[in-house]
Design a protein with these regions (language model features):
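N-terminal secretory signal peptides that target proteins for export/translocation
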Residues: 1-12
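Sec-dependent N-terminal signal peptides
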Residues: 11-22
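C-terminal motif of bacterial Sec signal peptides marking the signal peptidase cleavage site
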Residues: 25-28
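Bacterial signal peptide processing site
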Residues: 30-32
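Non-catalytic regulatory/linker segments of enzymes
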Residues: 40-43, 160
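Mature N-terminal segment immediately following signal peptide/propeptide cleavage
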Residues: 42-68
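N-terminal accessory alpha/beta regions
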Residues: 61-172, 176-187, 193-195
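Active-site substrate-binding loop specific to GH73 endo-beta-N-acetylglucosaminidase modules
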Residues: 126, 146, 182-281
Length: 281
C-alpha cells in the first residue's frame, strides 16, 4: 500500500484535484541524483524553497537538495530539456495498467461508440436505461484515469517544470468533459496534443490542439460546414487561445476564419481530423 506524501505539492493540488487525490493512496518519491556546484540564483534555503514552489508542484527536501548541489541554473536548464523523466516503479505500474495508457484514441472511441449504440438499440426500457448508465459510468472511469495519471505525474515526475506547463496549457486549452464522448478523449488530448509541446513553440502547440478531435468536437467545428457556418471554434481561437478579448479582431474576422475552418472535423476511422471537401467553403 502506498502512503500519502507529506509535502506542499498535495496542498497546492487540493483545490484542483481534490476528488482525484482523495481516491489515491500515494507513495513517497525516491530522491533524485545529486551533484554539481550551487550558484547564486537562490542564495538561501528559504529563497530556494520559494523559487521551487513557484516553478514546481511544491518544494520538497530532495528537490531542494538537488538544486543546492547542482545549482539553480543547471537544474532549470535540465528541467527545460527533460530526457525521459520516469516515475517511481509503483506509480508507473499504476499508469501503465490504465485503459487510456494501453488503448489508442481511435480504438477507444470506437469501443465507446459501439457501447453507446448497442445501449440505444435495446428495446426493453429497463435494459436500455441500465446499459446507458453503464456507458456513462465507463466514460466517467476513463476521465478519472486521465485525472489520476495527471496527478501521479505531477506529484512524482522529476520533470516538474514540464508538469507545471502541461497543467497550465490544459487550463488554457480546456475542454468540457460533459460534452459528447470527450471523457474518452481527455487522456490522449493531454498526451498527444499538450504534453509534447508544453515546453516548446506556441505555434506547434496551437496546431496540435486545433487538430485534436477533443478540441474540434468541444468547440463544434465538426459541425462547421458550408451553408451552416458554426463560428464557435473560430471565435474561441481568437478570443481565448491567441489574441484575447479586445485583441484587435472584428466579427468579420471571426466569420472569415470560421469559413476557412469549414470541413475540418473528426474522422475517427483514420485517427486524424479530416477536411471534408464537400463541406469546405
Amino acid at each position: 500500500m502506498w502512503r500519502m506524501r507529506s509535502d506542499t505539492r498535495l496542498l497546492r493540488f487540493a483545490p484542483l484535484w481534490g476528488l482525484c487525490v482523495a481516491l489515491l493512496s500515494l507513495s513517497g518519491c525516491a530522491p533524485l541524483p545529486t551533484g554539481g556546484v550551487p550558484d547564486a540564483l537562490a542564495p538561501t534555503a528559504q529563497a530556494r524553497y520559494e523559487w521551487l514552489n513557484r516553478i514546481t508542484w511544491g518544494a520538497n527536501t530532495s528537490t531542494a537538495r538537488v538544486v543546492e548541489q547542482q545549482g539553480s541554473a543547471r537544474w532549470l536548464q535540465q528541467q527545460l530539456q527533460p530526457q525521459g523523466a520516469s516515475l517511481p516503479e509503483s506509480a508507473q505500474a499504476t499508469v501503465s495498467a490504465m485503459t487510456i495508457s494501453q488503448t489508442g484514441l481511435t480504438d477507444l472511441v470506437h469501443t465507446m461508440e459501439k457501447q453507446r449504440k448497442d445501449a440505444d438499440a435495446l428495446r426493453d426500457d429497463i435494459a436500455k436505461k441500465a446499459a446507458q448508465q453503464a456507458y456513462q459510468q465507463e466514460l466517467n472511469r476513463l476521465a478519472r484515469e486521465a485525472a489520476t495519471r495527471h496527478v501521479l505525474r505531477a506529484l512524482y515526475s522529476p520533470a516538474q517544470v514540464q508538469e507545471q506547463m502541461t497543467w497550465f496549457w490544459l487550463n488554457h486549452f480546456n475542454v468540457h468533459l460533459s460534452k459528447h464522448n470527450l471523457r474518452a478523449m481527455l487522456g490522449d488530448y493531454e498526451d498527444s496534443a499538450l504534453r509534447p509541446h508544453a515546453l516548446g513553440r506556441f505555434r506547434d502547440l496551437l496546431g496540435a490542439v486545433s487538430y485534436h478531435p477533443a478540441m474540434l468536437r468541444y468547440l463544434d467545428n465538426d459541425q462547421n460546414a458550408a451553408g451552416r457556418i458554426n463560428e464557435n471554434f473560430a471565435r474561441e481561437l481568437m478570443e481565448l487561445h491567441t489574441l484575447g478579448v479586445d485583441g484587435g479582431y472584428t466579427q468579420k474576422d471571426v466569420q472569415e476564419l470560421a469559413r476557412v475552418l469549414t470541413g475540418l472535423g473528426v474522422n475517427m476511422n483514420s485517427g486524424n481530423p479530416n477536411l471534408r471537401k464537400e463541406l469546405n467553403r
